[in-house]
Structure formats: structure tokens, C-alpha cells
């Protein structure tokens, strides 16, 4: 029997309230209130009520986050308060100039008296996304607009409702009749990478960066597409009616930026947790310096620090110019993109024979370094850029990221320039280059190519592989060019006399090199396997394979005769299995293996090898049993699936988000926001080594 209308109305109200709270907890606080299955069931119940009783649908219902019909076009809307851009400062001196200007103006406004109120500065990370203006009427989101020209923007309410970190209704009693919230919509890095990977698979044009992807997403006419891209949002500014009196609330009209951010957070908005208040410019500069170094570890992109006068009365006294507020300035990070002129196109041949075109250009300062070269990756990239000699190109370098050519400014191309192509012959050995079907890489397949030999040797002696000291690139280059070393096993036949004749190689250095080469014979099996340089077999995968197969003999036999055994290992994909099979079937590689064994290189597990993974995988211990784990960042030796399997087999549980019930947060490189959340909640934080130690107890 159907419930009566008053009961249904009450039930739908309760469901809306609970589901909105659950959304806020999950997407903003990162602390789930309920399991996904519970949420889904309640959500379906609400959908069912609204389907049969459309009059009960409200604007703040979670069901309204997704509009059903794509818009035909966007409507222009005028901002009640202009959405201005900020002036920029590019160094400390320009920040000081801004400080002098605002103090001078405040003293003038104060009739040239001494300003009694000290100036505090609110420092916020400048999120690299798209500015939005959100309008709420009586606590319900009624309009969302882009910045546009600052005076008017485009109305994109249906799209913005799909952003789960933006509340559809304010989580406060007695909401104001009108409220405008300003903030930045952005695309998290991980989501951006996933979108571009999908677009690459579908042969669609890739987005240049998360900012462009965010802007393009917000202008999609179909909210379903916007929802699928999982945008996020940080609120940073609010405008309340001056006569608003929040009766019954402990929230009063904020008088400063830090208080406004607390208000926004209490009202249900996501605010950036890294905002700080400082009393001096030197503190501001220190904050900026810290984040200039740390910014690449954040899960979203930033392009500077916004410095604001914290006190709203002082902001009002300072006012605005025609384009920007006087009370705020953006202290920008060093440029990460810049135009420059192409000088030359050279080619690098890697250890696997892959030929990579490299653009050489006039030096430019980028991200704190002077950049002269940038990789073009492969022939496809070279072709898509349509690169000509003497072109003006745009180069990007973000932090530790390898410089890359973003685009060509064809409007500045010289009239008589000629197009550049990948050579048909290897630039090192002059053998014919080969490109396989559906392969992006163009390769030299000559095993005697000096560049391939040098690359293989550099990889073999590296710290992550055989860790042979004293054999750097210069030594390897001399050994190969003189014909002393033609393959990896030749290293183990070197003697002092062979090394003495090399540049900068004295008797003492030669002795150390011979000792280090001899010592490398007992390196752990996984490092030896990694050192062989098999395509697609990285350091972590080598550990997995070495754990599953105790020797080269076992692995070689499986690769050639029963590759399905290798495919069953978690973390090893079909591409890796095929690569292993191809490598071990190659006669020249088999000769390398045979010679290494003859010369005393183990190529098998020994008693000294770490068996941490093997000893744990089927065990159960009290340190893990019943405990809850969350992972963040990239693990060095294993992937997340393997780590999860290890935890579960040891009796633990893996969750996707941090909550008060979490026992351990396992951190890899480049940890995300979960790290700061864990610190706030006092969760025990461990690294990869701690994790293995925990499992082996």
C-alpha cells in the first residue's frame, strides 16, 4: 500500500538531507558516512519517490545534479559584482611595491594619520582552474556562471550541479535571502591523466593541461559529459547582504578572509586547507618558497600564491581599480611555458634502439632552470607538430618534468622554411630504421649499434640494477668506442691494463672499478633481472618476477614454454609477457645469459635476497589482521593491486578513503590529499619499507 503524501514528503526530505550530508562527507571531508551500497539503495528510493511524485522534486535534491537534456547554447548573465582578475607580482620586490602602494593609500584614506590597524595577509594557493560565481537564493543554488569578461559570464548551472563538492543547498539554519560564492573549479591531476589516456585510446585530441580540460568541460552542452569528468571546486570568496542577521546561528557576518573561509566550510563548501595568515611579507615569501617546491606533490595544479589583505574593512578602504581589487595580488611561480626559436633537430638512440627526436632551441628560463632541449618522443609527435626549421615553438617545463614542445606558432614561421622528418637511417650506425605496425617507436635493430650498446651498459651498471661504481657514461663511451666492450658480459673480462689507458682513469680508480664489477656478481636476482633491460620490465615488475621465479632458468623456461604462468602474476600484463617471451627466444640474448653465467654472475635467488613479499603473501599476522589500510602515492616496488592482495591475504582490509577507523596510511612517492587528512586525524603513516616490515612480523 502506498504511503500517504505527507509521509512521502517527509521521507523524501529526510532522504535528501541524509544523502546531501553523505555527499559532503564523501567528496569534501573525505570521510564516508556509509558504504556505497547503502548510499545507492537510499538514492534509488529517493529516485523512485520523485519519479512517482514529481511535485516532491526540489532544487537541492541529489537527483538534480544531472540534468536530463543537453543545453542548446549558453546564456549570458551579468555578474551582480564584477568578477575581477588579479594583478600579478613575479618576485619579492614587486610584492614589496604592492605593499607600499596599499599602505600609502590606507594612510591617505586615514587622512594621513598613522594606521592603527596592523595589516595581516591571508595567503592562499592559486588554483589553476576556472573561476565560478555561484548564486544561492534562500540557501539553494539557483545560478552558476563563468568569469567571462568579468562583467558578464555564461550561465552553466546544470553543469556545475554535477560537481559533487559544490553544495546544492547551504548547510546552515536561517540562510540569507541571497548569497554569492566565488571559487575555482579544477580538474585533479589523476583525473586529467585518465581523461587524456581515454582520449588517446579513442584517437581524440589530447588536452594540453588540466586548466584547459576544466574550461572545456564546463562549456560542454551535455551535463552527463561534465559529470563523467569529475571536476572539483574550492571556494575562496563570499558576498552576503550587509543587513543579514543570522538569528539562532553562531555564525556572524565575517569580518576577515580567514573568518569567511571558516563560514564557507561550515556552510558545506570545500575550502583549500593550506591557507595561512601572516603579519609580514617575509613570512609570505617563505610560504611562497615552500609551495614553489612542494606544489608538484599536490593532487591539483597551482600557479602561485594569492596574497590578500585579511581585514574586510581595510579591503573596503582600498577598493578596486577598473580591472582588479587593490587589496589582493597574485604572486606567480616562475614561468613554466615560454616561446623560443628552434635551432636544430637532433636524434637520440636509446638502449632498446628507439630513436627519439630532440628539439634544440635558444635557451629560455623555465621553472627556475635554463632549458635548451626538449624531447619530441617519436615520429608521430614530430608529424603532428608539423615542425619546420627555424620555427618559433612553445616549450613547457613543470618542476621535475622533462621539458616538452607544446606547439608551434605557425604565424611566425619564416617563408622559406622546410619541414623536418625523422631520418630513414640510424644516426649512430647508419643501419635502416624500422617501425612496426601500430607502433609509435621507430627503432634501430642493429645489436652492434654503439648507441644501443652504451645504453644497455649504462642501464646495467646503474644503482637500481648492478650498482657498479666508477663506470659512468664517459667511461662507457670510451670502452665502446675503443672496441674493448661490445656487450654486457665484456665488463666481467676487463682487467687493470684495459682500464689504465682510459681518460681520467688512474691505478686507484681502476682497482675500484674492478672490485665493484666483481662485487656486482652477487647482486640480488631481481636487480640482475632489471639490469638486463628487457622492454616493459621495470624495477617493480622485476621484483614480482624474481619473487615468482627463483632463477633465470625458471623464468626463461616459463617465458618460452608456459607464458600463462607469468600472466597469472598480479601486476604483470600481456605486453610484459610477450616482451619476456620475445627476449628469451632471441639467440643473441641467450648468448649474453650464457656468458654472464660462465663469468660468475649468479642470475638466481640467493639466501641473501629479500624474500619479504614471498614470506608475507600467504601469511596472517596480528599486526595486519583486522586492520584498515589506505594507500596514497606511487609505490616503488609493487603496484596497488599487489599491495591490496598482500594486505587482504594477511587478514587486513583496504579502503579507498581516510576515516577515523583507518589504522595505517601507506605512502608512496607523490602522496595526495589523503596524507594531510591522515595527519589531521592522527592516523599512523608508514612508508613502503615500513609496510614490508609490518607484513613480515
Swiss-Prot record:
Sequence positions that bind NAD(+): 36-40, 85-86, 124, 147, 184, 308, 332
DNA damage in keyword set: yes
GO MF annotations in UniProt: DNA ligase (NAD+) activity; metal ion binding
Active-site residues per Swiss-Prot or TrEMBL entry: 126
SUPFAM superfamilies the record matches: BRCT domain (SSF52113), DNA ligase/mRNA capping enzyme, catalytic domain (SSF56091), Nucleic acid-binding proteins (SSF50249), RuvA domain 2-like (SSF47781)
EC numbers on record: 6.5.1.2
Pfam families: BRCT, DNA_ligase_aden, DNA_ligase_OB, DNA_ligase_ZBD, HHH_2, HHH_5
Record has Cytoplasm as a keyword: no
Biological process annotations from GO: DNA repair; DNA replication
Cofactor requirement: Mg(2+); Mn(2+)
Protein residues bound to Zn(2+): 426, 429, 444, 449
Domain BRCT: 619-697
GO cellular component terms attached to this protein's record: cytosol
InterPro entries referenced in this protein's UniProt entry, alphabetically: BRCT_dom (IPR001357), BRCT_dom_sf (IPR036420), DisA/LigA_HHH (IPR041663), DNA_ligase (IPR001679), DNA_ligase_AS (IPR018239), DNA_ligase_CS (IPR033136), DNAligase_adenylation (IPR013839), DNAligase_N (IPR013840)
Keyword terms, alphabetized: DNA damage, DNA repair, DNA replication, Ligase, Magnesium, Manganese, Metal-binding, NAD, Zinc
Reactions listed under catalytic activity: NAD(+) + (deoxyribonucleotide)n-3'-hydroxyl + 5'-phospho-(deoxyribonucleotide)m = (deoxyribonucleotide)n+m + AMP + beta-nicotinamide D-nucleotide
Family note: Belongs to the NAD-dependent DNA ligase family. LigA subfamily.
Its job: DNA ligase that catalyzes the formation of phosphodiester linkages between 5'-phosphoryl and 3'-hydroxyl groups in double-stranded DNA using NAD as a coenzyme and as the energy source for the reaction. It is essential for DNA replication and repair of damaged DNA.
Protein name from the UniProt record: DNA ligase
Lineage: Bacteria, Bacillati, Cyanobacteriota, Cyanophyceae, Synechococcales
Amino acid at each position: 500500500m502506498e504511503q500517504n503524501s505527507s509521509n512521502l514528503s517527509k521521507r523524501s526530505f529526510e532522504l535528501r538531507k541524509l544523502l546531501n550530508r553523505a555527499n559532503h562527507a564523501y567528496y569534501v571531508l573525505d570521510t564516508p558516512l556509509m558504504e556505497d551500497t547503502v548510499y545507492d539503495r537510499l538514492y534509488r528510493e529517493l529516485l523512485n519517490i520523485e519519479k512517482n511524485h514529481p511535485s516532491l522534486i526540489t532544487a537541492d535534491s541529489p537527483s538534480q545534479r544531472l540534468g536530463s537534456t543537453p543545453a542548446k547554447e549558453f546564456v549570458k548573465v551579468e555578474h551582480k559584482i564584477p568578477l575581477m582578475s588579479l594583478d600579478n607580482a613575479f618576485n619579492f620586490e614587486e610584492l614589496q611595491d604592492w605593499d607600499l602602494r596599499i599602505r600609502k593609500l590606507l594612510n591617505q584614506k586615514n587622512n594621513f594619520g598613522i594606521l592603527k590597524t596592523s595589516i595581516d595577509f591571508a595567503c592562499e594557493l592559486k588554483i589553476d582552474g576556472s573561476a565560478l560565481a555561484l548564486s544561492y537564493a534562500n540557501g539553494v543554488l539557483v545560478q552558476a556562471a563563468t568569469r567571462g569578461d568579468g562583467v558578464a559570464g555564461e550561465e552553466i548551472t546544470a553543469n556545475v550541479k554535477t560537481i559533487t563538492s559544490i553544495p546544492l543547498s547551504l548547510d546552515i539554519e536561517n540562510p540569507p535571502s541571497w548569497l554569492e560564492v566565488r571559487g575555482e573549479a579544477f580538474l585533479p591531476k589523476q583525473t586529467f591523466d585518465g581523461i587524456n589516456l581515454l582520449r588517446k585510446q579513442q584517437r581524440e585530441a589530447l588536452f594540453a593541461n588540466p586548466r584547459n580540460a576544466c574550461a572545456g568541460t564546463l562549456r560542454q552542452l551535455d551535463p552527463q559529459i561534465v559529470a563523467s569528468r569529475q571536476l572539483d571546486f574550492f571556494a575562496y570568496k563570499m558576498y552576503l547582504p550587509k543587513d543579514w542577521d543570522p538569528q539562532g546561528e553562531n555564525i556572524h557576518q565575517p569580518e576577515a578572509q580567514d573568518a569567511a573561509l571558516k563560514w564557507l566550510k561550515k556552510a558545506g563548501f570545500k575550502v583549500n586547507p593550506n591557507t595561512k595568515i601572516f603579519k609580514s611579507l617575509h613570512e609570505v615569501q617563505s610560504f611562497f618558497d615552500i609551495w614553489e617546491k612542494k606544489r608538484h606533490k599536490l593532487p591539483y595544479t597551482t600557479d602561485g600564491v594569492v596574497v590578500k589583505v585579511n581585514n574586510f574593512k581595510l579591503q573596503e578602504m582600498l577598493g578596486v581599480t577598473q580591472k582588479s581589487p587593490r587589496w589582493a595580488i597574485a604572486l606567480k611561480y616562475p614561468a613554466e611555458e615560454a616561446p623560443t626559436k628552434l635551432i636544430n633537430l637532433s636524434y637520440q638512440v636509446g638502449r632498446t634502439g628507439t630513436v627519439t627526436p630532440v628539439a634544440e632551441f635558444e635557451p629560455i628560463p623555465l621553472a627556475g632552470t635554463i632549458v635548451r632541449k626538449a624531447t619530441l618522443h617519436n615520429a608521430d609527435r614530430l608529424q603532428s607538430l608539423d615542425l619546420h626549421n627555424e620555427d618559433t615553438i612553445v616549450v613547457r617545463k613543470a618542476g621535475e618534468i622533462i621539458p616538452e614542445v607544446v606547439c608551434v606558432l605557425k604565424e611566425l614561421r619564416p617563408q622559406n622554411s622546410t619541414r623536418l622528418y625523422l631520418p630513414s637511417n640510424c644516426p649512430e650506425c647508419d643501419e635502416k630504421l624500422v617501425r612496426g605496425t601500430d607502433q609509435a617507436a621507430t627503432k634501430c635493430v642493429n645489436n652492434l649499434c654503439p648507441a644501443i650498446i652504451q645504453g644497455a651498459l649504462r642501464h646495467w651498471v646503474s644503482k637500481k640494477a648492478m650498482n657498479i661504481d666508477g663506470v659512468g657514461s664517459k667511461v662507457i663511451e670510451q670502452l665502446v668506442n675503443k672496441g674493448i666492450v661490445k656487450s654486457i658480459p665484456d665488463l666481467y673480462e676487463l682487467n687493470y691494463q684495459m682500464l689504465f689507458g682510459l681518460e681520467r682513469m688512474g691505478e686507484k680508480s681502476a682497482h675500484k672499478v674492478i672490485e665493484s664489477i666483481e662485487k656486482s656478481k652477487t647482486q640480488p636476482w631481481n636487480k640482475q633481472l632489471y639490469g638486463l633491460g628487457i622492454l616493459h620490465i621495470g624495477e617493480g615488475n622485476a621484483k614480482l618476477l624474481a619473487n615468482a621465479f627463483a632463477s633465470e632458468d625458471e623464468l626463461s623456461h616459463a617465458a618460452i614454454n608456459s607464458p600463462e604462468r607469468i600472466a597469472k602474476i598480479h601486476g604483470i600484463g600481456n605486453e610484459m609477457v610477450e616482451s619476456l617471451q620475445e627476449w628469451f627466444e632471441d639467440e643473441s640474448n641467450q648468448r649474453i645469459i650464457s656468458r654472464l653465467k660462465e663469468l660468475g654472475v649468479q642470475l638466481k635467488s640467493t639466501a641473501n635476497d629479500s624474500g619479504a613479499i614471498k614470506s608475507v603473501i600467504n601469511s596472517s599476522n596480528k599486526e595486519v589482521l583486522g586492520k584498515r589500510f589506505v594507500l596514497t602515492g606511487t609505490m616503488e616496488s609493487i603496484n596497488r593491486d599487489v599491495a591490496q592482495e598482500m594486505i587482504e591475504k594477511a587478514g587486513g582490509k583496504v579502503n579507498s578513503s581516510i576515516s577515523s577507523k583507518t589504522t595505517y596510511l601507506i605512502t608512496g612517492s607523490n602522496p595526495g590529499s589523503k596524507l594531510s587528512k591522515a595527519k589531521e586525524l592522527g592516523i599512523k603513516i608508514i612508508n613502503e619499507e615500513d609496510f614490508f616490515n609490518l607484513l613480515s612480523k
